[in-house]
């Protein structure tokens, strides 16, 4: 609608003043259902072998074959500066599962679990953190349906995990 150029149709009420624009400058904006998608190219199990995993929902969900190994998938695009944040929904977490959400640096070899090497850290479903192969007290436990946030601050070498929006505390990480 060229007559409504600059009018926000979302519930946010961000209407803008239009200067030197005409209907030819107008394009439709579809802000709903925008998600960044994960580019998963590496998936491993604890033995360091390639793992059968499938992805659905625009690569927003990883489905593992549940062969008895600890299984994980890595994003393929690393970062080396700045501050980054993502959130994920915990699914299929059980009392006996070794569910972890973590951050790995470029030197991670793909063997062992996230947090087993000094080049990685993880937030475990039981509320512990794992850094350099050692578990220690960290935050609240999480289970199915919880939203886990990960704030990576490469500039200050910290990662902070969030459970349903509540910070669990900053963890120092090895830069690389």
Where does each model-flagged region fall?
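PRY/SPRY (B30.2) beta-sandwich protein-interaction domains
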Residues: 1-176
């Amino acid at each position: 609608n060229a007559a409504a150029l600059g009018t926000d149709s979302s519930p946010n009420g961000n209407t803008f003043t239009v200067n030197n624009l005409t209907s030819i400058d107008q394009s439709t904006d579809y802000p709903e259902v925008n998600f960044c998608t994960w580019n998963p190219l590496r998936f491993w199990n604890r033995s360091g072998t390639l793992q059968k995993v499938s992805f659905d929902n625009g690569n927003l969900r990883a489905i593992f074959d549940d062969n008895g190994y600890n299984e994980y998938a890595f994003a393929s695009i690393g970062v080396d500066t700045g501050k980054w944040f993502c959130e994920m929904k915990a699914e299929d977490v059980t009392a006996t599962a070794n569910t972890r959400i973590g951050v790995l640096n470029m030197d991670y070899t793909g063997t062992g679990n996230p947090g087993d090497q000094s080049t990685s850290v993880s937030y475990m479903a039981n509320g512990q953190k794992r850094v350099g192969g050692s578990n220690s007290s960290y935050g609240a436990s999480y289970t199915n349906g919880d939203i886990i946030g990960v704030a990576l601050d490469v500039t200050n070498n910290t990662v902070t995990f969030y459970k349903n929006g509540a910070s669990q505390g900053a963890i120092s990480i090895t830069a690389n």
